[in-house]
Amino acid sequence: MTDLPQNVRWQLWIVAFGFFMQALDTTIVNTALPSMAASLGESPLRMHMVIVSYVLTVAVMLPASGWLADRVGVRNIFFTAIVLFTLGSLFCAQSSTLNELVAARVLQGIGGAMMVPVGRLTVMKIVPRDQYMAAMTFVTLPGQVGPLLGPALGGLLVEYASWHWIFLINLPVGIAGAAATLWLMPNYTMQTRRFDFSGFLLLAFGMAALTIALDGYRSTGLSPAGLGALVAGGSAATLLYLWHARGNERALFSLRLFNTRTFSLGLFGSLCGRIGSGMLPFMTPVFLQIGLGFSPFHAGLMMMPMVLGSMGIKRIVVQVVNRFGYRRVLVASTLALALVTLLFMGVALAGWYWLLPVVMLFQGMVNSVRFSTMNTLTLRDLPDEMASSGNSLLSMVMQLSMSLGVSIAGLLLGAFGHNQLAADSGDAHGIFFWTYLCMALIIALPALVFARVPDDISKNAVIARRKRSAS
């Protein structure tokens, strides 16, 4: 990348900062949830909506982001994304009730949904194809640093300032990023086909209705009849989309994607698998602070080994898959994640806190292997003309499953705690014990899906040899 013009390098820095803001926000909030609950006068059992509202909004808006960038221009959409994200951060910091905070997180999620995919599209347009991989490695590095800093930084701000600062720190970065985008970034546009608004609205309503209904009366305040209407409406919208997409070449996501068996298995496995693993970033800081009495900063520091393990293992994932095959790796990593989840709970409740960083490191390693393998399996056999659509659908499902996972974790805590959760008490230990047992079962279930993956590693071996010869 040394031969790139100076203005292109600045444009890559802008995209990198966008990636950093979005990645930091996905992890910095988790550590602050118990403090937010105390400040807002809410039960900690309701605070999962702060996470769900953001992640679900990202899932809903992702399919529209690429089309908007092509139609309106990458600079205009990237600028809008940063502005919405920054305004959402400001409104989050000013929120005095949970409902206000959830509404502000929705606005923040709209910006976050456009920031990363439009950033990828921007890189594709401003650098030569032979330098695309190097450029993407550069802009995604801050996105990897964000999850590493997020939990500890969130805990530090909460403990020594207030939870409002986890959102206020986005303001100077957002203002600088928005100004730099207008000044330096070109506004590339492309001829686009008509956007499938009907399909988009059906999928958006279906995802939102079913996720909200999952929270039940405890979070929504709706009557049983109202919840039933949400379930019926969400299910009907999903079925209507399937009917709408049948034989429709302009559909948001073509059903022909599912003619590829590995895509179908990988997508369904990703949905189920990320529901389980999506519980962990929410549950871990809540358990450490409410169940064990850790300070916010201490809880944030305890999350760092998980991120380090996730980053460190990535270098050998390809070799592991080439050696053992997708099926064995996915089944083994899924069952290992369930076991390490139980181990974390057991070690914590036994008071062996010195072992927790080791368990968290192993958890991050297992989770990373599983994520990377799931992603590759899902997309590897798709025809070139369907790769972009398949990748967009996978990205949407990843966000949706994480929102479902957080919702289910909140549901389990509420069910076992009878909607009451006192900090660092014997009752809290029992509540978390049964919650973690159920979580481990949910995490393990996708192994049944992955057991159906064809046991064929030849294609990966060819890819690995090409990579070695090119290096």
UniProtKB/Swiss-Prot annotation:
Stretches that traverse the bilayer: 12-32, 49-69, 77-97, 106-126, 138-158, 165-185, 197-217, 225-245, 263-285, 290-312, 342-362, 396-416, 431-451
Disulphide bond pairs: none
GO cellular component: plasma membrane
Keywords assigned: Cell inner membrane, Cell membrane, Membrane, Transmembrane, Transmembrane helix, Transport
Membrane topology of the entry: Multi-pass membrane protein
Entry coiled-coil feature ranges: none
Location of the protein in the cell: Cell inner membrane
Signal peptide: none
NCBIfam families linked: PRK10504.1
Name listed for the protein in its UniProt record: Putative multidrug resistance protein MdtD
The organism of origin for this protein: Cronobacter sakazakii (strain ATCC BAA-894)
